[in-house]
Amino acid sequence: MTDKNPEYDFLWCPGCGDFGVRRALEFAMEELNITHERTMEENVVVAGIGCSGNTVHLLEGEQPYGFHGIHGRSLPVAMGTKMSRPDLNVVVVAGDGDFLSIGMEHIAPQAARNLNITAIIMDNGVYGLTKGQSSPTTTIETVTNSTPFGKMEVAVNPLDLYLTLGVTFIASGYSVKPRDLAKLMVRGMEHPGFSIVHVASPCTTYNDNFTQLKGSAKLGIQPTAWAIPEDHDAGSKTAARGIIDEGGVPLGVVYEDTSRPSFDAQFDAVRTKNPQKSPADLLAVFDL
């Protein structure tokens, strides 16, 4: 495919962090296409509902295949795609509301399976497409359109959740630096198992936390985004927990476990031991 849907006219708001995520995804797929000598059509982008879901329609240049599914169900769709076509690079794009609310129930099973897919989560701390309601990552006491007296629930800590559930690759990034973010996406896509790249992606309309993430010397605001030290041992769960407990938005690879086999590899081993028979082979055992 070489063309975007000509009838699709959705645009993100000016300054939306998702533009940076989209560009990073383009950089990552282009690099891996060269490295692995594959075409753009050998990539599939699966999305749920929300502003993040429109990534499948807004990518520039040569187009990967895209599946714009239903709310919270991007991981099951991605699993079906990967199991039927294990040769494809399958990428999930989802928002914090989509992935960590109705879609949260699917994270644990995928972590247990360790299927070789990559999920890119665009976290703006709010439901943007439906006009500014609180999401699972909205901080407590925050006033939104759905919490006029302040949110009463404690916010989900996504990185802590992923580590606890056993996701084998966890990275954290920031949408304002697409080139750096693309490097994390490449690492995730090359990881042999379930990988999640969680991205702070500010919503300029309903939750503009750009200044807090970046910091401002003029306003005396310390940045909440910070670079993970180069000597961080990403293979250590204890070290990963320490990074997460520091708070804020760490930038880099938080955790990677390459000791577990992927679900794909295990499934291929089973198929080798028990090869599938065609309908003709099955019918041949009967005297018809």
Model-predicted segments: where are they?
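Active-site diphosphate/adenylate-binding microenvironment
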Residues: 2-70
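Conserved thiamine diphosphate
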Residues: 3, 87, 135-188
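Short coil/turn connectors at secondary-structure junctions
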Residues: 8, 39-43, 62-65, 84-90, ...
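Short catalytic-loop micro-motif centered on adjacent basic/acidic residues
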Residues: 12-14, 92-94, 169-174, 196
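Glycine-rich beta-alpha junction loops
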Residues: 49-51, 124-126, 200-206, 257-260
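Thiamine diphosphate
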Residues: 49-128
